[in-house]
A protein has these predicted regions:
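Glycan-recognition and catalytic cores of secretory/periplasmic carbohydrate-active enzymes
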Residues: 1-353
Length: 353
């Protein structure tokens, strides 16, 4: 929302985004660990989100701890560059979170999958999703100019590459899949590899970025699957360009649109026809998944979108009132819309639409 507001010059939207981010930064910190809580409810801030019942160990997750620090830094950077307002308190908070996460790495340089909500100590490891911590550390180094952690970041990057990316087996991303092999955790690594290339100029990171994107592209269909079930089959929705979520969840969702900038970065530094085609696919797919008018997808208002797009009959759990299946989920998913906005308002931004 903040990126979109800054691109559009929408002051009301920007104020709403800054208010939300500022509230989280001011109130969501766990004083016992120095990390940000992951959810909020009637009982206050906590780490028991909707995914909690599927977890084996309670506590903070490296996935969300690193992701929250990364996006806090990204928001500060964007609002300073395009909005003219610095947020040193956000940068300092994210830096303190990164420091706590760095202290919890294991001997391989891997960040925790789960951290204690009492002490911040690492309790469980073995996950690609914790690469969000590495992405946050790299972005903090870029924004502050503090390069003192580069050697440790290089060690962590090498571990994630060898243990997950090089094997083509990235698991432990989303918290609701019991560490199934998925397409989400690698999105954090993709960001980290791009940032480390920016920081060092080392060709190694560009090669690793290419390999990580090649893995992510395996979750994209190279053809448009024939769809008969509405609403997707009725409106001409294209399955080509989006990414399947994981090996245990057969639908396409929009999270891969968040790395449009990274795909474009690779193409700018190592031009390749295949990468250019996947960039074009992802960009086109990202522009067709929301209601362009009320109830275009048989529910909701203009601008609404879901997270679930069923390219097959594997997850058509949504039903119409007459009991017939629907090929999407009739739900407003803010994170899904935000994923598209992050990609479409980034480096590829075209004010002409």
């Amino acid at each position: 929302m903040l990126q979109a507001a800054l691109r559009l010059g929408d002051t009301a939207m920007r104020a709403q985004a800054l208010d939300a981010i500022g509230y989280i930064a001011a109130n969501a910190r766990n004083p016992r660990t120095g990390l940000l809580y992951e959810s909020w409810g009637p009982e206050g801030w906590h780490n028991r989100g909707w995914w909690f019942d599927g977890m084996h160990t309670r506590g903070h997750s490296g996935y969300l701890a690193g992701q929250s620090a990364y996006y806090l830094l990204k928001a500060a950077d964007w609002d300073e560059r395009l909005g003219g307002t610095a947020h040193p308190d956000w940068v300092a908070l994210a830096g303190s979170v990164v420091a706590r996460l760095n202290a919890a790495k294991n001997g391989d340089g891997e960040y925790p999958f789960i951290l204690s909500e009492e002490t911040g100590a690492g309790l469980e490891y073995d996950s690609m999703g914790s690469a969000w911590c590495l992405a946050a550390a790299a972005l903090y180094a870029k924004l502050t100019g503090d390069r003192s952690g580069l050697e440790e970041m290089a060690r962590s990057e090498a571990h994630y590459y060898e243990a997950f990316v090089a094997r083509g087996e990235c698991y432990g991303g989303p918290l609701d899949t019991d560490k199934a092999v998925d397409s989400e955790g690698v999105l954090a690594y993709i960001r980290a590899a791009r940032l480390l290339h920016e920081l060092t100029g080392e060709a190694l990171y560009l090669r690793h970025l290419r390999d990580a994107l090649a893995y992510e592209f395996t979750y994209k269909l190279c053809y448009n699957s024939p769809l008969a079930v509405p609403p997707l089959g009725r409106i001409g929705w294209s399955s080509c360009g989006g990414s399947i979520t994981s090996t245990c969840n057969p639908h396409i969702h929009p999270m891969s649109s968040t790395v449009l900038d990274e795909i474009a970065y690779l193409q700018a530094h190592a031009p390749d026809a295949y990468v250019a085609a996947r960039l074009a696919d992802t960009l086109a797919w990202s522009r067709q998944c929301h209601n362009t008018f009320d109830r275009e997808y048989d529910y909701g208002r203009k601008g609404w979108m879901s997270e679930r797009f069923c390219y097959s009959e594997g997850l058509q759990s949504q039903k119409y009132p007459d009991g017939s299946p629907a090929s999407t989920w009739f739900a407003l998913m803010p994170w899904a819309g935000a994923s598209l906005l992050e990609g479409l308002t980034g480096d590829l931004w075209d004010p002409a639409g």
